[in-house]
Amino acid sequence: MPSARLDVPDDTSWVLWHFLTNRSNFMQNDLFDDALPPGDAGTPASGQAPGADAARRAAVQPAPTPPDLHALATALPAQLRMGASTWSYPGWDGLVWDGAYDASVLAKKGLQAYAQHPLLRTICIDRSFWRPLTVSQYVTYAGQTPADFRFVVKCPSVITDALVRAEDGRGREANPAFLDPALAATAFVQPTLEGLGDQLGVLVFQLSPLSWDWLTRPAELFARLQALLTSVQSQLISHPQVIVAVEVRDPELLVPAFADVLRATGATFCLGLHGKMPPIEEQLPLLRSLWPGPLVCRWNLNRRFGAYGYEDAQKAHAPFSEIRSPDPHTRTLLARTIAGITGRGQRAYVTVSNDAEGCAPRSIALLAEAVLEAAAQAPRAR
């Protein structure tokens, strides 16, 4: 039986309407949903009495920081910012939080404590990928962090996905708003600038996996991407601190023409470390072709789980308190890349998921140590 369709205008506005009324349900367990009243601290974590320590649960407190962790953070290059992909994980008890908190509490109130961790100087706002956020939501994020904290924000997929998708993620039809400059301005760039201000660090345009139809028309794809990035950069003239990065999910796009577009528009390539893309050493040539320039990297998933292994990784890594899938190969090469780029005065933003190795804060600490080791071994720039 064919699905019913509503008559809506044939322009990009209907795509945004469809996205907000349908695609937003794709992530049904969105921990950041605004349905939780601002004054509700959520339920206590497992093992806590319902009325215990209510005052403490009203605001999430940071875990005490060992002196060696402070020393490690101080020794890192000032140009380097590392952080996680979201922060609402009770398993970070003792690492980031001072005790056991429910995930809903951390989602609402944990960012302030997260931002006090000396190694966590940025965060990736993944939520914005699933639906556009409002200025007030970005203002709330900024208000929970110190002035020196920076945000990496993902563009809504209504702009970066070539397909309009059903709730199960399957493509239903072509997306007429794909890489639309006007929609990107109103639904992404303007709200982030207004809400985050000087704390906006990186705008990430993650292109969802493309159909073969698009992959066989790279010239048209890159022309559309260049038009989008040119428009975005025109809105950032007064915000030179903002880096624009493009992440792809198709290895076929790692070609010189892609680098030409990035170079022409002042954007950079976002290293995407997961099973859908080649290992880091096979992505670095494209990044090198853009030198000099900043580094943006999202270390999302250990390659041992394959291209579609997020669910398996979640099961293997929960509750995300320990390193369970160490990846020294990726860590070492990433550390060398960070050391080389920051050692020459360029900025580096690196966000790490729990699914990279099992626990993002521990992965970041290990990466920090590897960066210092790589910097000590690297020849000094002259």
Question: Where does each model-flagged region fall?
Answer:
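Extreme N-terminal basic, low-complexity initiation segments
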Residues: 2-10
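Residues lining hydrophobic/aromatic ligand-binding pockets adjacent to catalytic sites
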Residues: 12-382
